[in-house]
Every structure is written in structure tokens, then in C-alpha cells.
């Protein structure tokens, strides 16, 4: 059995959630991957966040309940997966930027880039606004991994608010590519 992250986890401050997601496992249907990179987008003052321009049909999920998926399309071709954070009414989300896709064989595959993650896992806009705290086929779970070694850098792929060190990265994921899958929960 596996331990799905609860709403209370996502209700915390976004920067705490972003760093704490490192080493957790993203489950989507039959796929599972260890999260190795995240970025935080926080509030209406964050010029790089979709919420900067206020509440819209597109950003409504960011203002909603913590723990819900926020999936959108960029450049008309790439889907990006975020999970909503902070209390309802405050717009914030964490972008999942990189994972180690687990398989029965090693080395496991590094999937870097939010568009590549969604393409590999087949996540699309139809997976937007799903409660990831109550869905056993689309969720994030605890693992037995302790990730203490991570770095904070400016967010990438944006042109505004580049001074914020809100990107969290496990600097060397080589060991995770050879991780024993017994250290992570199994699907039941």
C-alpha cells in the first residue's frame, strides 16, 4: 500500500511544499516516478505566475483547494503538471519539472522538462482540476527516500520574476536512476 499526500501537506507554504516534494513519488495510472525538480508559483504578486493577472477561467483551479492538479498547455503543444498549494483562495501551485521514471529494470529513466513528463505519462488538460489527495491512480505519495541534498536556483523558462530562487533541484540524480524499487511504494 502507499501513503498518498494529504490536503494538509499541500495547504502549507508553497516553498515548503516545493522542497518537500523532492523524493516523493508521482503516480499516474501505471506510471510512477520520483520527483527530482520543482518550481513554485505563488500569489498574484508573482509576475511569472498565471495568477498574476487575477482570477480567470484558466486560473480558477489555482485559487481552489490545495492538492488539486493544475494542467495547462504552453506554446500550443506542451502540457505542464502543477499541484495547487496554500489555503483555498490564495493562488499558488508547484510545477513538476523533472522525475525519474521507475521501471522494472535499471537504470530508470530521467524525464526532464514538464512537457516531457506529461507526454511520457499521457497527462493532458483533461487531467486538470483533479483532487490528487483522493485519487489512487493520479496522486503523489510518500516514499522511504530522505532528500536532504537539494539546491535552490532561479526558475527557468520564464522572462519575469527571474530573481526568485523558487526552483528546487536534486543536483545529482544518478543514484536514483539505480534505486531499488522496494524503497518506494508499490501499486495495489
Curated annotation (Swiss-Prot):
Pfam name, any one: Pur_DNA_glyco
CDD domains associated with the record: AAG
Record's keyword annotation contains Hydrolase: yes
GO molecular function, one term: DNA binding
GO biological process terms held by the UniProt record: base-excision repair
Enzyme class: hydrolase
The entry's keywords: DNA damage, DNA repair, Hydrolase
Tagged with keyword DNA repair: yes
Cited InterPro entries: Formyl_transferase-like_C_sf, MPG, MPG_sf
EC number(s) per entry: 3.2.2.-
Homology family: Belongs to the DNA glycosylase MPG family.
Name recorded for this polypeptide: Putative 3-methyladenine DNA glycosylase
Species for this entry: Ehrlichia ruminantium
